[in-house]
Amino acid sequence: MLKGFTPWPDELAETYRKNGCWAGETFGDLLRDRAAKYGDRIAITCGNTHWSYRELDTRADRLAAGFQKLGIQQMDRVVVQLPNIKEFFEVIFALFRLGALPVFALPSHRSSEITYFCEFAEAAAYIIPDAYSGFDYRSLARQVQSKLPTLKNIIVAGEAEEFLPLEDLHAEPVKLPEVKSSDVAFLQLSGGSTGLSKLIPRTHDDYIYSLKRSVEVCWLDHSTVYLAALPMAHNYPLSSPGVLGVLYAGGRVVLSPSPSPDDAFPLIEREKVTITALVPPLAMVWMDAASSRRDDLSSLQVLQVGGAKFSAEAARRVKAVFGCTLQQVFGMAEGLVNYTRLDDPEEIIVNTQGKPMSPYDEMRVWDDHDRDVKPGETGHLLTRGPYTIRGYYKAEEHNAASFTEDGFYRTGDIVRLTRDGYIVVEGRAKDQINRGGEKVAAEEVENHLLAHPAVHDAAMVSMPDQFLGERSCVFIIPRDEAPKAAELKAFLRERGLAAYKIPDRVEFVESFPQTGVGKVSKKALREAISEKLLAGFKK
């Protein structure tokens, strides 16, 4: 068992097995089975390249042998930072087959985050593309390696320069160690409201069950053609039902280099895409673009929208613009996933964020004193179930705060439940900014800013934004003369912070409002910036 992993209690695990939730299958088994069943059927389309299920299975075998030859062993962690390219699949399935654990980093992460992931996970390797969207990841790898000289294996998909070329690692398949379905399969990143992301351990058992239920709820089968427009390292496009759900169902995954309509719309037309997933800001962009373009999007049957709350007004436009069914998705990398059902009435689809996908999902809604609220009232969402984790990786202190004694996960979401068990998301309890689906931890950015010599104190809050839902505003108490906002943003970039974490607005103040117990009142700061924005709008 992976050290630092919190397993389900034996009694509950046995219940999930008896109920058929956990079928004893690994991801290696899953791909082998689909290769036998679907053979030459296309699994992955990337540009003009097509990989069949059989070819993907063979490549995973050969790459797993190469990883083992390199010295990567069962339970080793490997930071994988790959965009939407075909190599993503051979890499993760090779690691699954070997029993090594991918740690999924986002393409937008930079040296601060990647160095932390590699160090905290004690990574045996770091896998990157050569360059993507104008950014050279080999340069990033050099920065990371300069801070972590012990990181020896840097593997590159493409032109490797001084690093290891991914393609050269392919070797003759060998006998590999047995992987158990109860083993941790990979580590995902939490949204992170208390600084850098925590790592989320997902097992073969729990994650494959989540795929099975997603496939059933979303009506996927071998005729499904899914466009991966969002970065696949996110849990939502990975498994809700995402690319892995489509492979589970025997369908075809089409990779888009970006979610831009310029890239995505021609692919929908050419590949006859039937389903895709977006975050609300991108759904708005797509709807606006569709009115001025002539792409044939008639193959699209389902548009999923999740990652942040989608307004009812915008939700109502989807069917009129695209002629397809909207499916709202609300979930978390820690587990619980909710969907509106494809045959739900329109009022449920546009006004709720769905209901749990499994009959074994348990939910509680509590007030601030850990008491159940009355039906229909707003409160804190807690959950547990066969695919919701029991603890973060190597995070005892966080686990004590994030989980109840009986294993319910405190999601940090403020919700209310309808009579029919549908969830309406009202906001976040945690100090976290949801910038168009990308979660920004205020504390992480504040800590970086406090390293600037001209900054005495910093407090970052969300501010409303019509396009992204929320943007970030940081309030700064300067030491003497206030620095320029551009200087602070450049400072954060130099420290390797991802672009989406850079504050959208900087306000300089002499002091912060305080709560009754002497803490910074971020509620007052949010109100202050909202009022300022409103006043500016009225002018």
Swiss-Prot record:
ATP binds at G191, G307, V329, D413, R428, K519. GO terms for biological process: siderophore biosynthetic process. The keyword NAD does not apply. Substrate binds at H234, N235, S240, K519. One of its GO terms (cellular component) is cytoplasm. The keyword NAD does not apply. Keywords: ATP-binding, Cytoplasm, Ligase, Nucleotide-binding. Signal peptide: none annotated. It catalyses: 2,3-dihydroxybenzoate + holo-[ACP] + ATP = 2,3-dihydroxybenzoyl-[ACP] + AMP + diphosphate. Disulfide bonds: none annotated. It comes from the Bacteria. PROSITE patterns: AMP_BINDING (PS00455). It is an enzyme of class 6 (ligase). Involved in the biosynthesis of the catecholic siderophore bacillibactin. Catalyzes the activation of the carboxylate group of 2,3-dihydroxy-benzoate (DHB), via ATP-dependent PPi exchange reactions, to the acyladenylate. This is 2,3-dihydroxybenzoate-AMP ligase. The gene is dhbE.
